[in-house]
Design a protein with these regions (language model features):
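Membrane-interface transmembrane helices that cradle and orient dolichyl/undecaprenyl
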Residues: 121-126, 161-184, 291-292, 297-313, ...
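Transmembrane-helix motifs of polytopic, lipid-linked glycan transferases
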Residues: 103-124, 162
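Hydrophobic/aromatic-rich transmembrane helices and adjacent perimembrane loops
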Residues: 201, 325-360
C-alpha cells in the first residue's frame, strides 16, 4: 500500500513540475514576443505609424466592416476573409491606430515560439531559450519583416508550426493519428486557406506525408483520418460560405478571392520554367534575407539529419518544404515576406547547437547574433520619428473641411485613411498589384459620381482638369523617397 501511495505522490510531483516548467516557459516566451514586436514592428507604440500599404489596406477593410461595409463588395482587396476578420478585431481594439494589430502580432509570435518550445522539448533539447530568442530576432529583423509587420505570412506562422509539431509528435512516438488530431489539422489548414490559399502548399506536403505514414502505421484508420481532416477543413469553409450568402455577396467573394487571384497570378506553363523560377527565387531571398534564409536552410538539413533513423519524420519535412516552396514560387512574383514561413525549419538547428555547446556559450552566441541581426533592421531608425505626409495632408484637409471625403487615386493606402478616421466611399480605394484597367475606370467613375473633394497621389501627377494641386511633399516608402501630391476639386456640385 505504501508503495502505491508513494508512486502516486511521485506522479503528482512530476505533473506539478511539468506545469511549473510550462508556466515559466510561457512567461519567458511572452516576454520575448513582447520585446521583439515592441522594438521591431512598426505597429508598436514606439513608432508613429505603420506605413506598409498591405497592413493599412487590411486595417481599412477591418475598420470598414465595423461601419457596415462589405469586404470584396464595398472595399476591394484580394486576400482571404479570415485575415480581414482578424483586422476587424484589431479595429475593435483601436480604430485610429495599429494598437490592435500590435497585440495580435505579440500573441501570434508568442504562439509560434510556444510551438517551437514544445518541439524542442519533444526533441529533448537542453537550454532552448537562447535559440528561441535568436529565431524570434531573425524573424522580426529580416527584410521579410521590414515592410512594417502584420503580413499574412507572419500571422499564419503559429498555425503552420502547430500542425508540424502535432505531426512530429505522433510520428516520433509511432502512434496513429486520432480523430481529434485529424480534425484539428483540417481546421487549421482551412484557416490558412481562408487567409491566403497559396500557403496551403505546406498542408499539401503534410497531407501526403501523413497519408503515407498512417497507411503504414494503421491502415484501417487511413480512410477515417482522411475524412476527419476533410470534415475539419469544411467546417470553416462552409461557415464562410453561409455568412457570405446571408450577407448577399458570395459571388463577389468567389470572383475576387479565387477568380481574381487565379487569373492575375497565373502559374508558369512548363515544369522546367517552374524549377528555374524556384531556384531564382531562393537566391533572390538569400540576397534580401540572408540571416533568415541561412538559419532556415541549415535548420532544414539539420532536421533531416536529426530524423535520419525516422524516415517518416524526415519525409514529412522534405514534402512540406517542396510542396510549400513549389506552390509559393511557381509564378514570377517574389516579395520579401513570401519567404517568411521557411523560418519554421530553423528550429531544428537548436538541438544540434545545444548538444555541442554549454548554456553560457549558447547565451553568448545568441546575444551576439541577435545584436548583429538588430543592426540589419531598417525599422529601428524610424523609432520616435514624428511628422509625416499623412499627418500633414489630413490636417490640411480637415482645416479646410473637417467632413470632406478624400481618396488615394494613384498610390497605396499608407495610413492616410487611418490618420483621418476616413472610411473610403469607393470600392477601389488603393492601388494594388496587378491592377486592371477596369478597376482604374471604376475608380474614376466613383470619384465623379460621389464628388470626392480631395485626391492623393504618390509619384504621379494627376491629369484631371477638375482638380487643382494644392500641396506637395516628399516622404519615404519602402526605402525610397516618394513624391506625394494633394489635389482639391474645383467645383463641388
Amino acid at each position: 500500500m505504501s508503495y502505491r501511495f508513494s508512486g502516486r505522490r511521485r506522479i503528482r510531483m512530476t505533473i506539478r513540475k511539468q506545469k511549473n516548467e510550462q508556466r515559466t516557459a510561457a512567461a519567458g516566451l511572452l516576454l520575448i514576443s513582447f520585446f521583439c514586436i515592441t522594438i521591431f514592428s512598426r505597429s508598436s507604440f514606439l513608432y508613429e505609424r505603420n506605413p506598409w500599404s498591405d497592413a493599412n489596406i487590411f486595417l481599412t477593410i477591418g475598420r470598414g466592416m465595423l461601419k457596415g461595409k462589405k469586404m470584396y463588395t464595398d472595399l476591394f482587396d484580394h486576400k482571404g476573409p479570415l485575415l480581414y476578420v482578424l483586422y476587424a478585431i484589431a479595429a475593435m481594439i483601436s480604430d485610429r491606430s495599429f494598437a490592435g494589430v500590435y497585440l495580435i502580432e505579440v500573441l501570434s509570435l508568442f504562439w509560434f515560439l510556444w510551438e517551437c518550445w514544445k518541439l524542442l522539448k519533444l526533441l529533448q533539447t537542453e537550454h532552448p531559450f537562447p535559440g528561441l530568442l535568436l529565431i524570434a530576432i531573425a524573424i522580426v529583423t529580416a527584410k521579410a519583416f521590414s515592410f512594417g509587420g502584420g503580413s499574412v505570412e507572419e500571422l499564419a506562422l503559429p498555425l503552420l508550426m502547430h500542425c508540424l509539431v502535432l505531426s512530429l509528435k505522433r510520428i516520433l512516438a509511432e502512434e496513429s493519428f486520432s480523430k481529434k488530431d485529424c480534425f484539428l489539422i483540417g481546421i487549421l489548414a482551412s484557416a490558412v486557406f481562408l487567409m491566403k490559399f497559396t500557403l496551403c502548399g505546406f498542408f499539401a506536403g503534410l497531407a501526403i506525408a501523413l497519408i503515407l505514414y498512417q497507411a503504414r502505421q494503421e491502415r484501417s484508420r487511413l480512410l477515417a483520418c482522411i475524412m476527419e481532416a476533410i470534415a475539419g477543413f469544411l467546417v470553416p469553409v462552409l461557415i464562410t460560405v453561409l455568412l457570405f450568402s446571408l450577407n448577399g455577396n458570395l459571388s463577389d467573394f468567389l470572383k475576387v478571392y479565387f477568380g481574381y487571384n487565379l487569373n492575375q497570378y497565373p502559374a508558369s506553363a512548363g515544369i522546367p520554367t517552374r524549377i528555374y523560377r524556384m531556384a531564382r527565387a531562393y537566391f533572390f531571398y538569400l540576397k534580401n534575407n540572408p540571416v533568415l534564409i541561412l538559419f532556415s536552410t541549415i535548420g532544414f538539413f539539420a532536421g533531416i539529419h536529426e530524423f535520419h533513423r525516422k524516415p517518416a519524420a524526415r519525409n514529412l519535412l522534405i514534402l512540406i518544404f517542396l510542396c510549400w516552396y513549389f506552390i509559393s514560387f511557381i509564378g514570377n512574383i517574389f516579395i520579401a515576406y513570401y519567404i517568411l514561413p521557411m523560418i519554421c525549419f530553423s528550429v531544428f538547428l537548436v538541438p544540434i547547437i545545444s548538444r555541442k555547446m554549454n548554456r553560457k556559450v549558447m547565451i553568448s552566441l545568441s546575444a551576439g547574433l541577435s545584436v548583429l541581426c538588430a543592426f540589419g533592421s531598417s525599422n529601428l531608425r524610424t523609432i520616435g520619428r514624428h511628422g509625416s505626409v499623412q499627418q500633414d495632408f489630413v490636417s490640411l484637409i480637415q482645416s479646410y473641411d473637417p467632413g470632406a471625403s478624400y481618396l488615394m487615386l494613384e498610390g497605396y493606402d499608407q495610413g492616410f485613411y487611418l490618420e483621418g478616421g476616413e472610411i473610403p466611399s469607393c470600392r477601389y480605394f488603393s492601388a494594388i498589384n496587378s491592377e486592371t484597367e477596369e478597376m482604374k475606370q471604376e475608380r474614376l467613375h466613383c470619384i465623379e459620381e460621389k464628388q470626392i473633394r480631395y485626391l492623393i497621389s504618390m509619384d504621379h501627377e494627376l491629369d484631371l482638369p477638375e482638380y487643382d494641386l494644392i500641396a506637395q511633399e516628399t516622404g519615404e516608402y519602402d526605402g525610397a523617397e516618394r513624391t506625394y501630391r494633394l489635389y482639391e476639386r474645383k467645383n463641388l456640385q
